Regions:
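Hydrophobic alpha-helical membrane context
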Residues: 54, 134, 152, 202, ...
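A short, flexible helix-boundary coil/loop motif
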Residues: 178, 199, 203-205, 230-243
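Short, acidic Gly/Pro/Ser/Thr-rich loop/turn segments
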Residues: 110, 163, 229
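Amphipathic alpha-helical protein-protein interaction segments
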Residues: 47, 220-222, 226
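Polybasic low-complexity intrinsically disordered regions
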Residues: 1-154
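Helix-centered, glycine/charged polyanion-binding patches within enzymatic domains
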Residues: 62-64, 131, 135-136, 141-218
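Composition- and surface-driven signal marking solvent-exposed, interaction-prone regions
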Residues: 115-116, 149, 207-211, 233-241
């Protein structure tokens, strides 16, 4: 375990994990592993050790600062995560970061990703993840609104969100049919997250700070792509032609 930790620390210090992800992505691309018939955007929480701070310290951290008393206690400061944030989803509270990914809908390989604090809404990742000429993109109901539509239009990408019902404004029949069709495709991204959680234990990180957590999440995404590539090759799952 210490050997792996030291190896990961070396990669993190030299900012090499994300370049390694890009190199492997290029190798996958050269072998036609991305079908480019469609892609899915979604996010999963990566929890970290919960902090025990006073109200004053919490307010300082939330404002982007570091409590004064920590500056004289470097050992204590090293054990404090000032980057992770709290958020709430479906009645459950999470503390940590968020792995926001762009996944090829046919191969289920990760094309790109960005790491944010858990409190950052999914729609904020849209700008970082979609690129000019991307295929039709299936996004969740959080990635809607004028700003998201503008980004998609500027990059010539057709975004297909899961439409949301509002009070006194239920979905009509056409919207419900669209949601069912889109959900059948988008559910494949949950297979990616399930593999990460069960096989790579990605739901929780022991690292402190965004730099180390981003590196750990990047490594998880890289290892997932390696595992998925081996699975596609071994089982002969590649039945598409690159668009």
């Amino acid at each position: 375990m210490k050997t792996f930790w030291a190896f990961r620390e070396t990669l993190t210090r030299n900012e090499l994990i994300e370049p390694l992800f890009a190199i492997f992505h290029t190798a996958l691309e050269a072998r036609g592993m991305f079908a480019r018939k469609g892609q899915m955007l979604d996010a999963t929480f990566v929890e970290v050790a919960r902090q025990r701070n006073s109200r004053e310290d919490k307010a300082t951290i939330k404002a982007g600062g570091v409590p004064e008393e920590w500056k004289d206690q470097p050992q204590k400061a090293r054990q404090k995560d000032v980057d992770a944030r709290w958020t709430k989803k479906h009645g459950e509270r999470y503390y940590g970061d968020k792995n926001q990914v762009k996944v090829d809908s046919r191969s289920k390989l990760i094309e790109d990703f960005t790491v944010t604090a858990a409190s950052v809404p999914d729609r904020h990742a849209l700008e970082a993840l979609i690129a000019e000429g991307d295929p039709v993109t299936y996004v969740n109901s959080a990635s809607t609104g004028e700003r998201c539509e503008k980004i998609s239009a500027e990059r010539n990408v057709q975004a297909k969100p899961i439409e949301r019902a509002y009070r006194n404004k239920p979905l009509n029949g056409s919207q419900q049919r669209n949601n069912r069709a889109r959900s059948k495709i988008r559910v494949r991204v949950e297979h990616v997250f399930a593999t990460m959680r069960m096989c790579l234990r990605s739901a929780w990180n022991r690292c402190i700070g965004m730099t180390r957590n981003r590196a750990t999440i990047a490594m998880t995404n890289l290892v997932y792509n390696m595992v998925r590539f081996e699975q596609i090759e071994r089982l002969g799952l590649k039945n598409w032609r690159v668009a």
